[in-house]
Design a protein with these regions (language model features):
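Class I SAM-dependent methyltransferase "Motif I" SAM/SAH-binding loop
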Residues: 63-65
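Class I SAM-dependent methyltransferase SAM/SAH-binding core
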Residues: 67-101, 114-130
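A short glycine-rich, Lys/Arg-flanked "PGG" loop and its adjoining helix->strand segment in the class I
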Residues: 159-171
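Core SAM-dependent methyltransferase catalytic element
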Residues: 259-278
Length: 278
């Protein structure tokens, strides 16, 4: 009997098969403040690879979508393994890669000898919970942005993803991850009630974790998202082979960072975490 892949909620299964969502994804996220913020962080953490490097560095892009992160990384000289469960999304990415290759061939640019060459992008259709086909130590770094980790249903499944990534990334490599904050619900209408319901349900149902929610999203009535507490995220990463270096608190609008928790600054809408493979 057919079953959905592990960690994939019903709404997520619908999402990854919607071609219109993939076709209009770039326009949808174009003005998303968090995309600008995470791009700035990536530029600092993964600034680029020069041609003088002995070999290219490989970045694992988890939930790569249409290449919003993969293409800028490749432009800085990184090779990228782009993993997504959505075939329509990967189709858009492949089209962009082919266009970029044609541009590189027909419009060569004069660059310094130590400037980075455009890296290779390797799209793979896969469930993030099931990455056993990727070899140990295949990547130097990894990114998991735009709340992709929260789209995975079940804490054990999310930990499985983190463990896979720790296995694939070489020791000393970096992970940059973005998630939504569970307690941001307190700033929303009815948020206290929804958090209470989620907590009670997490006690009575083995299929529900505190912070799980479904919501209407781009024509889908039950899109799944798990929202993390800071403690939960740090605990899970630490238990799965990662040393947490920095936890950055995003404003509710995701357009700026807040101060440290003890220094005030309001409730965070989400977190961007930088971690190192132990």
């Amino acid at each position: 009997m057919w079953r959905r892949p592990p960690g994939v909620a019903p709404g997520t299964w619908q999402y990854v098969h919607q071609r219109p969502i993939a076709d209009h994804y770039d326009a949808f996220v174009e003005d998303a403040a968090v995309c600008r913020i995470d791009a700035e962080i990536l530029t600092k953490v993964l600034p680029g690879v020069s041609n003088s490097a002995e070999q290219p560095e490989m970045v694992l892009d988890l939930g790569c979508g249409t290449g919003r992160t993969a293409l800028p990384l490749a432009s800085r000289g990184y090779d990228v393994i782009g993993i997504d469960l959505s075939e329509p999304m990967l189709g858009v990415l492949v089209g962009k890669v082919l266009t970029q290759k044609q541009q590189n061939q027909t419009e060569p640019t004069q660059q310094p000898s130590d400037a980075c060459a455009f890296g290779q992008i390797y799209p793979i259709k896969a469930n993030l919970v099931d990455l056993g086909g990727i070899a140990d130590g295949a990547a130097d770094h990894a990114v998991c942005l735009f709340a992709t980790m929260g789209m995975i249903q079940g804490r054990s499944n999310r930990r499985t993803v983190m463990q896979h990534v720790a296995r694939i990334v070489r020791p000393g490599g970096k992970l940059v991850i973005h998630v939504h904050n569970r307690w941001a619900a307190l700033a929303e209408s009815g948020g206290y009630r929804s958090l209470t319901r989620s907590w009670l349900r997490s006690i009575t149902s083995k299929d529900h974790d505190f912070g799980d929610a479904t919501y209407a999203y781009r024509g889908l009535s039950e899109m799944f998202m798990h929202r993390f507490s800071r403690r939960e995220l740090v605990t899970d990463l630490s238990a799965c082979g990662w040393q947490v270096d920095e936890v950055m608190r995003l404003a509710i609008e995701a357009d700026r960072f807040l101060g440290k928790f003890r220094n005030g600054g309001g409730v965070a809408g989400g977190f961007i975490v930088v971690a190192t493979r132990k």
